[in-house]
């Protein structure tokens, strides 16, 4: 809230999180719907009372644990050949499948999807 209050000149806010950061972002948005225009989840899914209409969910096709948790149909982008760790730059993550596309490709596709989602509003 402090950041949003400090930058009151910014009229549209989107919160984004990867993995458990997505859970935290989703939790914040569910309690502060009046302050945020949208939620962007990378390798994560909606937690709490957040509209799928105002949420963009992006996950790699090889990140099957996320797919199992998604019970909504709107604003979902599946990056073919992508995995969980390639949304970040932290290397291999135990239990993650090996991506069949490069980290750069996955991140570029992610940027494009986020840009399109934000511009639609």
Residue ranges with predicted function:
Residues 37-90:
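The feature captures the conserved acid-bearing segment of alpha/beta-hydrolase catalytic domains
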Residues 1-2, 92-95:
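Cap/lid segment of the alpha/beta-hydrolase catalytic domain
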Residues 9-12, 34-38:
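Loop/turn elements at helix/coil->beta-strand transitions in domains of secreted/extracellular proteins
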Residues 16-26:
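Gly/Ala-rich beta-loop-alpha elbow adjacent to hydrolase catalytic centers
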Residues 94-121:
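Catalytic active-site module of serine/aspartate enzymes centered on a nucleophile-bearing elbow/loop
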Residues 27-31:
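Active-site signature of alpha/beta-hydrolase-fold catalytic machinery across serine-
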Residues 1-15:
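Alpha/beta-hydrolase active-site loop
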């Amino acid at each position: 809230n402090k950041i949003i209050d400090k930058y009151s000149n910014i009229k549209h806010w989107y919160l984004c999180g990867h993995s458990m950061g997505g859970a935290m972002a989703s939790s914040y948005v569910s309690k502060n719907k009046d302050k945020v225009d949208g939620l962007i989840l990378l390798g994560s899914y909606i937690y709490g009372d957040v509209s799928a209409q105002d949420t963009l969910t992006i996950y790699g096709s090889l990140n099957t644990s996320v797919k199992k948790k998604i019970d909504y149909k709107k604003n979902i982008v599946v990056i073919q050949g992508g995995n969980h760790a390639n949304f970040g730059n932290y290397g291999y993550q135990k239990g993650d499948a090996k991506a069949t596309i490069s980290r750069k490709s996955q991140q570029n596709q992610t940027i494009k999807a986020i840009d399109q989602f934000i511009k639609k509003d």
